[in-house]
Amino acid sequence: MSTSETNNIKAPNHVTEYDSVTNNIVVAALYKFTRFADFEEYREPILNIMLDNEVKGTLLIASEGINGTISGTRQGIDNVLEYLRSIDAIGSFTFKESYTDAQPFYRTKVKLKKEIVTMGVENIDPLQSVGRYVKPSDWNALISDPDVILIDTRNDYEVKIGTFQNAVNPNTETFREFPEYVAKELDPAKHKKVAMFCTGGIRCEKSTAFMREQGFEEVYHLEGGILKYLEEVPASDSMWEGDCFVFDNRVSVNHNLEKGSYEQCFACRMPITQAEMQSPAYIKGESCPHCIDKATDEQKARFREREHQMQLAQKRGEAHIGSDVIDVIEKRKAAKIEARRQADEANKAKAD
C-alpha cells in the first residue's frame, strides 16, 4: 500500500467476495504514514467509534501515523473508516479487505505507540524517502530478474508457512532485528537491485527507507504487500508458494484470501499444521512441538487457566476479552446510567 491516496478496489473473481449471509464479516487492513502530532487525543474517540459499531481488532496510533487490522459488519467497518478519514491528520487512505464467516478478533484495542511498526531506528521517515513501489501485476517480472535479490522482511515463523519463489529469509524473530541483518549480510556495492515484500506493505515502508539511508539506491517493494498480490494475481500466474500468515484468528490465508490450513498455538503463537496438532507435544492452549521444552511449569499453568477461561466464556456465548476493553465498556455503561439518572431527575424537577 503506497502513501498515495486511492480508493479500495473490488476484488477479482478468484478472491472470496463479501456475502451478507455467509462471508459477512469484513476484515480491513490499513495503514498510513502521516504527521499526527495530536494522536494521543484520538485514542478514546477511535475506541468509542469501534465499540459503538461492534468492530473488533487493533489500531496503533503514533506521531508517525496509524496502522492496524479491524473486523466487523459491512456497516460497522464503513462507519469506522469514515470516522478515521474525518480526522484531519489522517484524511484519505488505502486499505485492503478480505471476508470471512466468523469474527477473527476477540478484542477491541486502540494503542498509543512510539512507532506504528517497530524497527527501533531513529529518524527513519517513509514520508521523506522510500523504495520504488511495484504493482502486483509487475512484480513477477521484477523478481524474475537474476540481478535482483528478493528479501522477505517478515519474521521467520511467517516466512516458514509461505513466501515467494527464491526469496531470502533473514531469519529474524522480530522486525527490530532487520537492521542488523542488513548490516551483516547486504552490501550496496554488491547488491545493486533489492526487492522487498511483507504482508500488507507497512514493514517495507520502513525497511526500504532504512535501506536507502544505508546507501542502497535501487530498492523496490511490493505495493500493497502480499495480500494485494494474492488479491490481484490469479493463482495460475502466481509466484507465491504456501499460505500467508495474518495476525488474527484465521492464522493464515490462502491464495483466495480464505482461511488457510494452519492453526495457532495459543501458548507460543506459532502457526502449527494439522500434523503437529496430532503430536503428543500438542496440548490445546498449553503447548505445541515448537514450545513444549521452552515454557516453564508456571507458564504452562497460566496457559491452562487461560484456556479454561476461554472455554467457559465460549459456553456462555461470550468472547474472552481483556480487562482494558472491559474497563472501557463498564465506564461507558456507568456513564449512560448516570446520564439517564440525571435526565430522570431533571424531568421530575420540571414536573414539580
Curated annotation (Swiss-Prot):
Residues 144-238 form the Rhodanese domain. It comes from the Bacteria. Its EC number is 1.14.-.-. Transmembrane segments: none annotated. Signal peptide: none annotated. Keywords: Oxidoreductase, tRNA processing. GO terms for molecular function: oxidoreductase activity, acting on paired donors, with incorporation or reduction of molecular oxygen. Gene3D superfamilies: 3.30.70.100, Rhodanese-like domain. It is an enzyme of class 1 (oxidoreductase). Pfam families: Rhodanese, UPF0176_N. The active site is at 198 (cysteine persulfide intermediate). InterPro entries: Rhodanese-like_dom (IPR001763), Rhodanese-like_dom_sf (IPR036873), TrhO (IPR020936), TRHO_N (IPR040503). GO terms for biological process: tRNA modification. It catalyses: uridine(34) in tRNA + AH2 + O2 = 5-hydroxyuridine(34) in tRNA + A + H2O. Catalyzes oxygen-dependent 5-hydroxyuridine (ho5U) modification at position 34 in tRNAs. Belongs to the TrhO family. PANTHER family: RHODANESE-LIKE DOMAIN-CONTAINING PROTEIN 7-RELATED, THIOSULFATE SULFURTRANSFERASE/RHODANESE-LIKE DOMAIN-CONTAINING PROTEIN 2. This is tRNA uridine(34) hydroxylase. It comes from Psychrobacter arcticus (strain DSM 17307 / VKM B-2377 / 273-4). The lineage of its organism: Bacteria, Pseudomonadati, Pseudomonadota, Gammaproteobacteria, Moraxellales. The gene is trhO.
